[in-house]
Amino acid sequence: MENKQLVKYNFKTKPFKHQMDALDASHDKKYFALFMEMGTGKSKVLIDNIVHLYDRGEINFALIIAPKGVYRNWVEREIPQHFPDDVQYRVIRWVSNPNKEQEREIKSVKDTFEGITIFVMNVEIFSTVKGRNVGNWLAKRFGSRGIVAVDESTTIKNTKSNRTKALVQLSKDFEYSRILTGSPVTNSPMDVYSQTEFLKKGVLGYSNFYAFQARYANLQTRNMGSTSFRQVVGFKNLDELNKKLDNFSFRVLKKDCLDLPNKVYMPRYVSLTKRQLELYEQIRKEALVLFEDGRLVSAPQMVTQMLRLQQILSGYLTTDDGYQENFETRRIDALLDICYETSGKIIIWSRFRYDIMKIAQVLSDNFGENKVAKYFGDTKDDERSEIINRFQNPNSDLRFFIGNPSTAGRGLTLTEARTVVYYANDFNLDTRIQSEDRCHRIGQNKSVTYIDLISEGTIDEKIVHSLVNKIDLSAKVLGEEAKEWL
């Protein structure tokens, strides 16, 4: 490809060196992959690339597609933070069941606009006919002067899914295409095929998945009754595959980025199931009754109600008589996505014993028991020191430290981790500060990414906002402030 000079413009936020390197590599490419580990700022690189192409007169439309837990970040955080103020733009967020105001905003995409339009959709909607129809209409209407990007592109790794097929087809109508992910391979090198097909059909040199698989996977015929099938038992020619990917990608790990800030905070949004919504509303109304008629509410009463709401977000509820109801939660799926997207060791904090047990089981099932350790009240003293030693050993296979911040949040050194996930936060500010500092100690120059799982429209938002902004919740949840939260 002809290398066109990168247009210099006034960055709204100064890029780190690795971000500038990524922009230099990708700015003029028709298709490109940003393989940048979580916390290295790949969203900013894409935004700067969009602005560059707009400044050069190449595009006036961008379609950004991301998982439900991420696509809201683009609208509320990434675009406002990084898009230059001197560039005229509008952001339209797709909502599956919009209210009247949201519906007007979505329909406004048909209106003439002098600047650049950024349309943000969640990737899950492309599993539906409605989502595919909207995406196809946008592609036909704006694709010739547009760019399409999939954030966390491992969401389209399944070659057989309707979502993947729809997006691979849709991308053909766009002049520019991008994929963004921390790691294009979550389980198997076979994962990269459909992601690269989204960028450009046949870019790896194969007209179909089976030809690609035959080149890079070792296959054996298995018999099951009267039927037989071909099973992947290993991989081959991976150096060749990596060289092909290098032609249209930029890769960076957090450990290689020396100028990142010490602490990077990222929200990950999790929608509630129907059962969670029902129970949450029921308990919320019960809590509000406590405030009626000017009744004096004690701190323990208020904390109990808050805890019950938090339990619902984690997928269970303990009644006054001790009965525990368990139900589906998408929180564990969001955690799994993070674990697959991120390399290296991870700390996962939750205040609830139920969460710790469930997380440990799910991660063991997905990654192996030897990769997982629990550190909470049930953990014996001799096991505790062994867990710390294994986790701190960079050559150890222990990858996931799952703990209660009240038990493990003080005094321990867990500096091998570069990623921390808060599955269910404690209300106590000091507990949060102490737990953050387990993997980030004085004199250390590495960057740590802190990810809070947040269910939109719930007390999660209030809790995380307060803790990240160093507000002591233990004082604020008493009285009228708590009523506002509910």
Predicted regions and their residues:
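Walker B catalytic acidic pair
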Residues: 151-152
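Conserved Helicase C-terminal RecA-like lobe
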Residues: 27-28, 37-41, 45-67, 126, ...
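Conserved P-loop NTPase motor "coupling/switch" region that bridges the ATPase
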Residues: 59-61, 76, 81-82, 86-91, ...
